[in-house]
Amino acid sequence: MNFLPSTVLLLSFVVAIISGSFSSISEEWKAVCECNLSKLNNHAKTGNCKTTALWKVTSDTNCTASEYLKITVFPANDDPLNRVEQCTMTPCDQTEKTPADCNVAFSAAKLAEIAKEEKSKMII
């Protein structure tokens, strides 16, 4: 039993050292889908939706801002960017946005939240 206080003290010291080595992380998150839709002949949708998201992650050593944009036009048109996700992932200290694959700029969980927001607003 004499080893118990020494072991607890040693473990407390190790935990304190390990926890001090992690940096603090903060994030800002917002996803919005704005739609202007109506039904055409009670069947097909007509109008458009604009989906945007911003995910800013800051740690002790760096900061990254990821942006998402998708414009959806109903009925579909010939615009090659219709219904195409466009993303950027840029260090916060830079003004020129860097294009990025959306799967790199956003986590799978964040992309799922964007899709959920979009789906909820496209119902008419």
Swiss-Prot record:
<feature type="glycosylation site" description="N-linked (GlcNAc...) asparagine">
    <location>
        <position position="62"/>
    </location>
</feature>
<feature type="signal peptide">
    <location>
        <begin position="1"/>
        <end position="23"/>
    </location>
</feature>
<dbReference type="InterPro" id="IPR009981">
    <property type="entry name" value="DUF1505"/>
</dbReference>
<dbReference type="Pfam" id="PF07403">
    <property type="entry name" value="DUF1505"/>
</dbReference>
<comment type="similarity">
    <text>Belongs to the UPF0375 family.</text>
</comment>
<keyword id="KW-0964">Secreted</keyword>
<keyword id="KW-0732">Signal</keyword>
<dbReference type="GO" id="GO:0005576">
    <property type="term" value="C:extracellular region"/>
</dbReference>
<protein>
    <recommendedName>
        <fullName>UPF0375 protein Y45F10C.4</fullName>
    </recommendedName>
</protein>
<feature type="glycosylation site" description="N-linked (GlcNAc...) asparagine">
    <location>
        <position position="36"/>
    </location>
</feature>
<keyword id="KW-0325">Glycoprotein</keyword>
